Amino acid sequence: MSEYMDDVDREFINCLFPSYLLQQPVAYDLWILYLQHRKLFHKLKNTNLINADENPTGVGMGRTKLTALTRKEIWSKLMNLGVLGTISFEAVNDDYLIQVYKYFYPDVNDFTLRFGVKDSNKNSVRVMKASSDMRKNAQELLEPVLSEREMALNSNTSLENDRNDDDDDDDDDDDDDDDDDDDDDESDLESLEGEVDTDTDDNNEGDGSDNHEEGGEEGSRGADADVSSAQQRAERVADPWIYQRSRSAINIETESRNLWDTSDKNSGLQYYPPDQSPSSSFSSPRVSSGNDKNDNEATNVLSNSGSKKKNSMIPDIYKILGYFLPSRWQAQPNNSLQLSQDGITHLQPNPDYHSYMTYERSSASSASTRNRLRTSFENSGKVDFAVTWANKSLPDNKLTIFYYEIKVLSVTSTESAENSNIVIGYKLVENELMEATTKKSVSRSSVAGSSSSLGGSNNMSSNRVPSTSFTMEGTQRRDYIYEGGVSAMSLNVDGSINKCQKYGFDLNVFGYCGFDGLITNSTEQSKEYAKPFGRDDVIGCGINFIDGSIFFTKNGIHLGNAFTDLNDLEFVPYVALRPGNSIKTNFGLNEDFVFDIIGYQDKWKSLAYEHICRGRQMDVSIEEFDSDESEEDETENGPEENKSTNVNEDLMDIDQEDGAAGNKDTKKLNDEKDNNLKFLLGEDNRFIDGKLVRPDVNNINNLSVDDGSLPNTLNVMINDYLIHEGLVDVAKGFLKDLQKDAVNVNGQHSESKDVIRHNERQIMKEERMVKIRQELRYLINKGQISKCINYIDNEIPDLLKNNLELVFELKLANYLVMIKKSSSKDDDEIENLILKGQELSNEFIYDTKIPQSLRDRFSGQLSNVSALLAYSNPLVEAPKEISGYLSDEYLQERLFQVSNNTILTFLHKDSECALENVISNTRAMLSTLLEYNAFGSTNSSDPRYYKAINFDEDVLNL
């Protein structure tokens, strides 16, 4: 397949899909997806599907261009705010202006309706507002919009503010009339600053009392705030997160109104917004892998990793392609999460998520009633984590390894942003869960939007736990174990809820916790794994389908396997976050990974090929564990009964002179066929009456790396392939190389000499026919099709008379060569081409002696070829569907293969060679193993090395 792919196709493929996946067997399926939409990608340069990678979140996609008046108005307002810096009016693009303007004026949802839509009656363009609107209060214009985090704080402090409404009203009555307007303008900001410390001094970062006092001072400034200082704050806002980055840490009071505080451990919880790094890359300046000695190494990795790919496609292109692997996070129907438009750039819990789930806040309700409701909610099953999963699950019968990374943008941390309230990992897909043997279940009705089904709806079937066996740990817990030995759920005997329900994330989740560094499978039995991860850390999560393990990485450092024995299960990427935490995700589609996933994958490929090459020796080593029992059996039962069970003796008992052991009962063959059988080139005796039957021996392949059987067989196959392709001179050169390599050392040269004699006989026997086919190849490659037809008539007179299809292929190729060499400016050449086309039509389409099925096929091909006459330069101008007729692949390689196979069939010779059969059979075998998810060498827990083999890329493209 790869020989027909040009550089343009490969460039698209490398941009569209992660590089490590293109080295797996799944690469074949990815190529199929691309080739099915190949025409779409070749027209992308003239469409809007490419966004030049300037707008990863999709803001402004598909919008009309701003009018000059609208652009000028937006430019003026933003320049007055001082947020455009030194960017010139001509250099800034429309999408950037819209994005920045919408940040400072969030009520504007559609600029094309407000500024650029023509009035149908007056045929005029409406402008933004009157000039008087431009002279609004400077403080109101320059005050940055509240961020999502600040909205979360408002939602948490609203109860306290409502409780003090009466006091606030009394204070307002005492204020002067001149201050009323200013107080109204900044009421929201004062409410926020009463709870938030904006001091950026690192020394006071952990001092809660000082921060509270300073917050009160800021809240008392009111309308006397300096406009210049407000403008300086606005200058720091280049995107919706810069305003947060200007704060080093924001203390969150952990009284009863803090709805997501669940333990005394988080009594010092602080909010750490994203850093001020302008880069959207996954590279991080702060590296903490959990192992201090690896910090320097990780720093070097990060400095050279996380680069942007050349993928400039819109995210919807993967939906068009039918991409069957994860590409974005799933939006939850209960609005528990805020997700960027592309589904990966930004993910955080909805600040108002808890208010949706608990009760409707009403201004008419009394403070005591609200306190009772709040206390009732906190003492019941509240949800601490908002969860989501990827849009696609992982097909375990296609993948070798799957890997993705997240970068932590902001955290709520108790350790100076060194930890986070984030859980990353994988979740079992609903249909992979086994029915429980116990009827006991714990209600999860309070956990909205976190069911196990991918659709996002709550379903009590998500409480199903795996069946089979269980083990007792003391007298306090029952663990229900999967077949591989992984605990999927744990229920306390006393009926208390488990960890997944305590925090609100799903059952059957295998995750790495950012707040304590533990790994958990949704049970109380968490295990120490690594250090916690915090802000700016890049955490990777991979699943290895070869050995059935899940592993994690931190800032490019592999942390080791976290879970094992997870074979034959279907997973989906999963993440859980508390409010105040946010992440950016990399599925490998738009950015390279920080971790060297290709190097990790190559190590497993090396193990796989090592396992294949010494597979029979591995069988011997396995038998060595039972060597004592084998000796006892031999003593008791005699050597005759033990002979069939001793793998070592079977391996050493190979008859090098008579051929394979499985051929002993076959009919007697002549010397030539016997020699072919010896090198696996003869007739396959497993076929009886055209049906493949199971052989009565365990080993049908007696090749070994310990002797010369494997290289000798390959040398015969190569010679056979060269002769089959008509490359007789190359075959002779290959024979000379074999003669030089055959060295007589203690009689070990006999096998090599047998190969040389076999190849000599094959060349001598086929030399005449090989020369004929070699001459045909030369004439076809030179485009001398007319001479080729005459040569075949002279050397094999009856061939063309009995093969009308070959005659048509040759004459059609001759017609194509004429079109390829013709000039559109020469009228005589055009006339000759038309006459030649009519001649072919009369000979192959209108001749009633030709069967109708052949005439229809000839007519279709000739119609496609005739369409090339409509183009002055068909190689450049014609669509690829018909310009392919003029390619070298069609006029040279394909034409020779058709001619060569026809000659071999006419001479009653095999039209296939042994090497091609081995390759096709190997492809079929690997495909079958993947399709049925076959076990490893001996059982389901052994590594499944065949999953790492990409035969075409690893072997055939060396």
Curated annotation (Swiss-Prot):
Its main location: nucleus. It is found in: Nucleus; Cytoplasm. Residues 273-289, 443-463 have a biased composition (Low complexity). Residues 297-306 have a biased composition (Polar residues). Residues 769-826 form the CTLH domain. This is GID complex subunit 1. Pfam families: CTLH (PF10607), SPRY (PF00622).
